[in-house]
Amino acid sequence: VACVYPADVFAERHQHPAQHNFGVEADMNAIEKTPRNLVMGRRHFLSGATALGVGAGISAPAIISRATANETSEVSLRDQDLRFIGTEETFSTPELMALNTINEDHRLYLEETGLAELGPRRIGAMDEAGLNVQILSAHTPSVQNVPGQEGIDFAYRLNKTLVDGPMATYPGRFQAFATLPLQSPEAAADELERSVREDGFLGALTNGHIGKKYLDHPDLEPVLARAEALNVPIYLHPGYPPDEVFQIYYSTTRSNYTEEYQDYIFSGSGYGWHQEVLTQCIRMITYGVFDRFPTLQIIVGHMGEGLPFYYKRIVGDMSEVTEDSLKKPFEQYFHDNFWFTTSAFFQDELLHLLLKYISVDRVMFATDYPFVNMKEGTDWFRAVNLPREDKEKIAFRNAEKLFRIKV
């Protein structure tokens, strides 16, 4: 199960089985079954995703079709030379995995995926897929549960691991989003600036709430202000819910339905992760983040985390109640302040829904490696029946523009 809670949260919830609905016997059964469960975890739910989309476009939408197998083959052959920048590609280290895994089986599973492998295996997968560049980011929840100076030092070590490791060993193949100690906002802002100016990082990636606060909270404004000043984006990756939310939304009193971690998958990659990011996006608009930081840029993965599906309802209802409090129409912020990626959602109909509302100029390619097959993602996109110009924008040109890099 790639989608699980960090060890400390998991342990706390299992110290009180009556409260958290996990008896000792159920725990042991779950752990004994872990290898099978891990295999069917995050990838299973993501590959089975259905109607998600995204939201808001000024220009006419790009139309996707896949009329016949022959036409698909012709399009795919035409675009075999397409270049790719992967904008959501995950890594970890033995130290980080030890912090954020629930047991030894889970740690072994993450090792088997290649999450901590930043050498020949990863480069080989990139070459096989035809992925030119990976933008690396630390596995959720990263260091956001590590308090004080310990978290500050840990974030620095993770960032330096990339600079001194794969970025130095394979020049041009790896870029990175900074890991930030967001629980210490001033230090996080300083580490963002240091990593961008000294090490050439492209921005930062966050993982859900920070001590039960989202990025619209006043405490986190130093990070937003620094990102805007540096002209670098922040990627909103999902995180795990606070315990109170987990209990109300995702837990059950029927312990036989927790033996295979149904509630954890439900609260994570099976559903909760996507709802969590979408909520944070709406909060950032509604509570004036982009009025205070008008040029701040936010990236959202997983084909918009459900936003396209809900787009007209959200815009219709939220526009009315924010017209006096916001400086611009509600939906305009989606045009001006958000970018979206394809990570892990390799489906034509989802991309079509995304492009119905979001300009093709604000969509970027991503795979979500190693939790999905990288080649599956590039093969899928090569066969998407879009004009070559639009496909180049999504595959690499939009990322080149946003991050000021070249493939």
Residue ranges and their predicted role:
Residues 90, 239-241, 285, 304, ...:
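Catalytic metal-binding/acid-base residues of hydrolase active sites
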Residues 85-87, 134-136, 176-178, 204-206, ...:
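Hydrophobic faces of well-ordered beta-strands that scaffold small-molecule active sites
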Residues 81-83, 87-116, 146, 242-275, ...:
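Active-site gating loops and adjacent loop-to-helix segments of metal-dependent hydrolytic enzymes
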Residues 29-65, 73-85, 92-133, 160-164, ...:
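Mid-to-C-terminal alpha-helical segments outside catalytic/metal-binding sites
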Residues 132, 136-280:
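Active-site gating/metal-coordination segments in enzymes
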Residues 1-40:
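N-terminal secretory signal peptides
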